[in-house]
């Protein structure tokens, strides 16, 4: 939403997670992923919840490994870089979730920004969606300690 001076304002809705992975703020998503100001706040919240659930399923084995080793929260992991007290694992988690949420919201973004969309809008939107989902998958692979690609001998 825009204020009278054209300054964007972001919602301050905290989305509660499962206790291991960090809670996320919908306003952080709006700011970091440059969502259109006309986008419905509740729709953004729902997309983030869906992305959280999707990432949590993919990260279940990693979470179980941490719990088995006495680490009860992603915030308690002490390896890796930190920014303002937030560790690399939590930052990666947030980035993976936000990439998936934005991929989910892309069709809505297109209708907010381009009412008379060109004929290639659907293709660009699908390409961007694929890039965002690939970004999320790369981050999750990194969280598991894997590189961008893996070769396995059959």
Language-model segments: residues:
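Conserved short "hinge" loops at termini or chain/domain junctions
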Residues: 1-77, 138-141, 145-154
């Amino acid at each position: 939403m825009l204020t009278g001076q054209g300054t964007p304002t972001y919602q301050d809705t905290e989305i509660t997670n499962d206790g291991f992975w960090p809670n996320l703020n919908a306003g952080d998503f709006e700011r970091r992923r440059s969502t259109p100001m006309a986008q419905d706040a509740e729709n953004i919240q729902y997309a983030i919840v869906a992305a959280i659930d999707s990432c949590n399923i993919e990260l279940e084995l990693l979470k179980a490994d941490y719990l088995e080793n006495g680490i009860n929260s992603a915030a308690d992991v002490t390896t890796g870089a930190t920014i303002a007290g937030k560790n690399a694992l939590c930052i990666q988690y947030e980035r993976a979730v936000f990439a998936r949420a934005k991929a989910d919201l892309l069709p809505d973004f297109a209708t907010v920004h381009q009412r008379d969309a060109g004929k290639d809008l659907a293709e660009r939107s699908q390409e961007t969606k694929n890039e965002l989902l690939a970004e999320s998958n790369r981050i999750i692979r990194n969280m598991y300690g894997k590189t961008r690609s893996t070769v396995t001998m059959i």
